[in-house]
Amino acid sequence: MPVPPEVDPSTDPLNDPEITGRKGSRAIPLPRPGAGMSRARRAEILRVDHAGEYAAVQIYRAQRAVFEGRKGKDAIADDLTGMEGHEQVHLSRFEALLNQNRVAPTAALPLWHLAAGVLGAGTALLGEKAAHACTEAVESVIEQHYADQIAELADRDPELARELAQFRAEEMAHHDHAVEHGSREAPAYRLLSSVIKAGCRAAIKVSERV
């Protein structure tokens, strides 16, 4: 199971090498100017992040259901259980933040539930490497999404920025674990990865708005 690095809560996430130093990861952009943010923008951030973590839990859960109990699949089932656990922690935190800020989840949540379950089960049925390719694609979009938010929040809400930095570190650990376990050897890897990434980006846009 991937072990994510701990982020020192006293460290500015913009300068933490564990967050910005991974080879191939686009650097976190400079903070956007201005202090504070509108309630509407904060609601967008919490709503879309809650949706993303909800979908991640469903993907890993569906993949785990395919592999559990199958001969020779104990290792990947255990890995998926661990990663699902990380995502559940993230999801629980965003559920609390939605409640605290009186923000409703995205109206598209039932759609994401179905889509994530199909994606998770479908890639797992294609084999371990396809399941890892799914993880790599999803986490590459999510870690950059978090990077953009960290930049936006660094001066406006540093406490939330630090939480997102820890979550991002865990998403990156999932990504790297997938690559190390053969994600790029999956059948039709480039096509599979491109389609999943496009779907994730579309879901982000929708979840911010509704």
In which residue ranges do the predicted regions lie?
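Non-heme di-metal
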Residues: 1-210
